[in-house]
Swiss-Prot record:
<keyword id="KW-0812">Transmembrane</keyword>
<feature type="transmembrane region" description="Helical">
    <location>
        <begin position="84"/>
        <end position="104"/>
    </location>
</feature>
<dbReference type="Pfam" id="PF04955">
    <property type="entry name" value="HupE_UreJ"/>
</dbReference>
<dbReference type="InterPro" id="IPR007038">
    <property type="entry name" value="HupE_UreJ"/>
</dbReference>
<dbReference type="GO" id="GO:0005886">
    <property type="term" value="C:plasma membrane"/>
</dbReference>
<keyword id="KW-0732">Signal</keyword>
<keyword id="KW-1003">Cell membrane</keyword>
<feature type="transmembrane region" description="Helical">
    <location>
        <begin position="61"/>
        <end position="81"/>
    </location>
</feature>
<feature type="transmembrane region" description="Helical">
    <location>
        <begin position="170"/>
        <end position="190"/>
    </location>
</feature>
<comment type="function">
    <text>Needed for full hydrogenase activity.</text>
</comment>
<keyword id="KW-0997">Cell inner membrane</keyword>
<keyword id="KW-0472">Membrane</keyword>
<feature type="transmembrane region" description="Helical">
    <location>
        <begin position="144"/>
        <end position="164"/>
    </location>
</feature>
<protein>
    <recommendedName>
        <fullName>Protein HupE</fullName>
    </recommendedName>
</protein>
<feature type="signal peptide">
    <location>
        <begin position="1"/>
        <end position="21"/>
    </location>
</feature>
<feature type="transmembrane region" description="Helical">
    <location>
        <begin position="114"/>
        <end position="134"/>
    </location>
</feature>
<keyword id="KW-1133">Transmembrane helix</keyword>
Length: 191
C-alpha cells in the first residue's frame, strides 16, 4: 500500500512536465509584463511611492489608493496597446514621480477619494507607457496581467516600507526618501 502511494505521488509530480506543449505561447507576454515595471527607475519609484503614501493616509486608503492606481493603469495600458496617444507622456511620468515623492516627503493628507483620483491620473500615463512598449509577438493579455502584478508587488513593497516610518528617525528617513524620489522626478524632467 505504501509503495502505491509513493508511486502515485511521483507520477503526479512528473505530469506537469508533460504539460509544456505550449511553451512561450502565453508566458512570454506575462513575463515581459512582469519585468517591465522593474526595468525603469521612474516606474519603480512611482509605484513604491503610491504604496507608501497610501499607507501614510491610513484606513481604507491603504487598499483603495493602490487599487485605483492598478485599475486606471490597466486602462492606460489598453490605450497604449491600441495606439491611442496621450500628450506629453514622458513629461507627465517625470512629473508624477516628482509629485508622488513630494506627497510622501510632506506626508500630505487628503481624503481617500481625492487621493485615488490623484494616483489614477498618474497611473494613466504609467499604464500608457507600459502598453506602447508591448513587445512584438507577446500576448497582450498576459503582458497586461504581468505589469499589473508587478505593480501590485511594488505597491505592497511601498506599504511595507511605510510601516518602518514610526518614531522620529523613521519619519526623517521617510521624508528624506520622499524628497529623493521628488528629486529623481525633477532629474527625469531635465534630462
Amino acid at each position: 500500500m505504501k509503495y502505491s502511494k509513493i508511486t502515485t505521488t511521483l507520477a503526479a509530480l512528473a505530469l506537469p512536465s508533460i504539460a509544456h506543449a505550449h511553451v512561450g505561447l502565453h508566458a512570454d507576454g506575462t513575463l515581459a509584463g512582469l519585468n517591465h515595471p522593474f526595468s525603469g527607475l521612474d516606474h519603480i519609484l512611482a509605484m513604491v511611492a503610491v504604496g507608501f503614501w497610501a499607507s501614510t493616509l491610513g484606513g481604507k486608503a491603504v487598499w483603495i489608493v493602490p487599487s485605483a492606481f492598478v485599475i486606471v493603469m490597466a486602462g492606460g495600458g489598453v490605450l497604449g496597446i491600441e495606439g491611442i496617444a496621450l500628450p506629453m507622456v514622458e513629461t507627465a511620468i517625470a512629473l508624477t514621480v516628482a509629485m508622488l515623492g513630494l506627497l510622501v516627503a510632506f506626508e500630505v493628507k487628503i481624503p481617500t477619494p481625492v487621493a485615488a483620483i490623484v494616483v489614477g491620473i498618474c497611473a494613466l500615463f504609467h499604464g500608457h507607457v507600459h502598453g506602447i512598449e508591448l513587445p512584438t509577438m507577446s500576448n497582450a493579455t498576459g503582458y497586461v496581467a504581468g505589469f499589473l502584478a508587478a505593480t501590485v508587488i511594488l505597491h505592497v513593497l511601498g506599504i511595507g516600507l511605510a510601516s518602518l516610518r514610526f518614531g522620529k528617525a523613521g519619519q526623517v528617513v521617510a521624508r528624506v526618501a520622499g524628497g529623493a524620489v521628488a528629486l529623481a522626478g525633477a532629474a527625469l524632467l531635465v534630462g
